[in-house]
Amino acid sequence: MKLSLRRKFKGPKYTIGDLSIDGTFFCNTIEDVIRELPDSCPNTSRWIPCKCKEKVYARTAIPTGTYKLTLEYSPKFKRKMPYLHGVPHFLGILIHWGNTEDDSGGCIIVGENSVKGKVINSRATFKKLYALLEKEKDITIEIY
């Protein structure tokens, strides 16, 4: 299964995107603001939090790229969640529910972008996405 996240609107504090599954539109997303980051981080590959000056903790969208996605247990959510592997500068990046970039903390929030600067119906959208993901073994997400 291939997920694609096309970032289409870059606001002053948030980024809105379209998430597609195998080429078909599925939902909208909201993330933090995009910041220019170095190509790699010497810390996160060793599971040490990023200290790069360009990154603002919990206020920066993840870099563009293609990432492996698996369902992993999240202590915060107390359940399995879609987890992105190998994201430079970031640890613990998930796809989850929320409404604004304040709920993101660097993660990807799914929902419907029918209100400026937020997504709605996020929990219902997440449940539908999760039901599709849990049937798959080989999942990637391309972010551009």
Task: Identify the role of each PLM range.
Residues M1-I139, Y144:
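Cell wall/extracellular polymer interaction/catalysis modules
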